[in-house]
């Protein structure tokens, strides 16, 4: 059975940008519910023996939605860290500059893409098979690992449960908080993978 992975930080570690109350609901209830539902759907089937990634790449409907949301949320938590944010360095900085011209330009494009990503959704920075970087929007449980050769580097959760307690309907303010928490070390590990 799949388990809810431990958060890589304490429940209050992302304050004031993301509150403990948000994490209690977002991680403790929403993320956990996806895990519980996925286990209920795959129990007693051949999918129970597969990895989360295999299930995401080969399933549809409720199984896909719950598996992808488990994966997406775990990835998102790792994209965040207390006392993080700022600008990337090294290979990540170089790759972003090559793709977008500058970090400021990338940040503006990613933020604009996230703010205008309609409904329950995710915005991603991905590395394509040819090594180029791109900003990709997915709807609902959409997950870039379903695309051959695409490696997710960074994501922001744009479902309302990610920000409504702290920011109400102000997605741009949530994005300001997101940039203060980006874990560039995790992005760097993904880029090197």
UniProtKB/Swiss-Prot annotation:
First-tier enzyme category under EC: oxidoreductase
Coiled-coil ranges from the UniProt annotation: none
Pfam family, one: Sod_Fe_C
Family classification: Belongs to the iron/manganese superoxide dismutase family.
Listed EC numbers: 1.15.1.1
Reactions performed catalytically: 2 superoxide + 2 H(+) = H2O2 + O2
Cofactor: Fe cation
Database matches in PROSITE patterns: SOD_MN (PS00088)
NCBIfam families assigned: PRK10543.1
Name by which UniProt lists this protein: Superoxide dismutase [Fe]
Positions of Fe cation binding: 26, 73, 157, 161
Keyword Phosphoprotein: no
UniProt subunit comment: Homodimer.
GO MF term (any one): metal ion binding
Organism, as annotated: Photobacterium leiognathi
Function noted in UniProt: Destroys superoxide anion radicals which are normally produced within the cells and which are toxic to biological systems.
Annotated cofactor note: Binds 1 Fe cation per subunit.
PANTHER family: SUPEROXIDE DISMUTASE, SUPEROXIDE DISMUTASE [FE] 2, CHLOROPLASTIC
Record keywords, A-Z: Iron, Metal-binding, Oxidoreductase
């Amino acid at each position: 059975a799949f388990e809810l992975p431990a958060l890589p930080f304490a429940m209050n570690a992302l304050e004031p940008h993301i509150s403990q109350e948000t994490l209690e609901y977002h991680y403790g209830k929403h993320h956990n519910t996806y895990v519980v539902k996925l286990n209920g759907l795959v129990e007693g089937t051949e999918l129970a023996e597969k990895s989360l990634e295999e299930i995401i790449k080969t399933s549809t409907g409720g199984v896909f939605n719950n598996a992808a949301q488990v994966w997406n949320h775990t990835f998102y938590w790792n994209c965040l860290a207390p006392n993080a944010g700022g600008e990337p360095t090294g290979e990540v900085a170089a790759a972003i500059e090559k793709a977008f011209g500058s970090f400021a330009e990338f940040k503006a494009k990613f933020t604009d893409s996230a703010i205008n990503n309609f409904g329950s959704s995710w915005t991603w920075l991905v590395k394509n098979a040819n090594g180029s970087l791109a900003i990709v929007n997915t709807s609902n449980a959409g997950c870039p690992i379903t695309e051959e050769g695409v490696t997710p580097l960074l994501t922001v959760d744009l479902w309302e449960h990610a920000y409504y307690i702290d920011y109400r309907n102000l997605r741009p303010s949530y994005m300001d908080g997101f940039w203060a928490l980006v874990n560039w070390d995790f992005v760097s590990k993904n880029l090197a993978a």
